[in-house]
Amino acid sequence: MNAPKELPHRATQNRILDLRDERGSLEMFTPLPRVLVTCATGHMSEAFADGWITATQRLMERDQTVSVFNEWGQMASYESGARRKLTDWMLSHRTRFSDTNFTTNSRIAAMGVSVAGAAVALVSIKVELHTREEFLRRLDVTLRGRRA
């Protein structure tokens, strides 16, 4: 598969997951050892959430924190079970996140990010929803080895 056009080429190095069905897609990359980039389109299913959890197992076992960038600009909807699974995944790996960044154009996806963000904020995981421009700026800074 080709790298998503929504992301800079250097963010799509080292693909660790590529799931597709008739309703959507989920791609995941680790362009640097401590950076996880996801790109979701269409509908986020529980099967996609299960794939996410499996694909990131080794990454979460490392003794280091990870910056997560979720490009969900083309994601239109999600199953509530997928949101629950990914929220539980974040909670179970809460010491592994340095920052978690999202961009989306969907009100439904933004609502899901807000609900999950409220749940994980209780254990000091910061979830930030950005404009596309700010998301790309932060991703660029992180890929260059600096923090935004």
PLM feature spans:
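Amphipathic, Lys/Arg-enriched alpha-helical "gate/interface" segment within cytosolic domains
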Residues: 2-148
